[in-house]
Amino acid sequence: MCEICSIKTSWLPKVYESYEEVGTLLPELAKELGVSDQVKIVAGAGDNAAAAVGTGTVGDGACNISLGTSGTVFISSDKFGVDENNALHSFDHADGSYHLMGCMLSAASCNKWWMDDIIGTKDYGAEQENITKLGENHVFFLPYLMGERSPHNDPNARGTFIGLTMDTTRADMTQAVLEGVAFALRDSFEVARSLGIHIARTRICGGGAKSPLWKKIVANVLNIPVDIPENEQGPSMGGAMLAAVACGEYPTVRDAAETIVK
């Protein structure tokens, strides 16, 4: 690839594991911060990979859903798997195994758009209290407000409501938004399952996870238990855990996850 793109390999940086030390703090920064210049700088990870570590998503079939502005399904696997027909990412995992990751572009942002821009309210909880018929809604919502990435990978996909009638209520449409996001997350689950990965339960974090109703809808749609970690700040916790491994506090990322995450 470097040859095709006329990139010299000497231009490429050294690759580190996410839990490896890459240096120490610059003396001038250490002085400004009032700390030792021997403070280690650790490679770290991107937001979703760090969130997986911080939510204990290690071990075959372990899963975490990040229900934020976008929606991410992160699934750990002991074997490398690729689905050539769907847009799920396949990578190495920090604990030495592999992971699949599906990222939908609009998740909690769909709910924000519906509540803030269409209904015109900031009281999300009050709106959700009007939803009383889970499993009976005849209104459907496709959450493709910004196109889609996983698993459909179509920038031209667009959102829509389906099944509106004269009897449709505001609560029906609010429910449809929450359910539409949940079913879009399920699309990535189904791709992972088609590769032979067994997912028995999942953790969930992110702003959308603060809604008890939405968590219940996700659990119903996926038909598996949904757990809430004690510390819901997955990315920052994951970064701290990777640093702890680099400093020798834990021998491996998996040991850190199994010890710290509850």
Where are these regions (language model features)?
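Active-site core segments that coordinate phosphate-bearing ligands/cofactors
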Residues: 3-4, 27-262
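Glycine-rich phosphate-binding segment of PLP-dependent enzymes
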Residues: 2-10
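Short beta-strand to alpha-helix junction loop
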Residues: 18-22
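A short helix-to-beta-strand connector/capping loop
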Residues: 10-11, 37
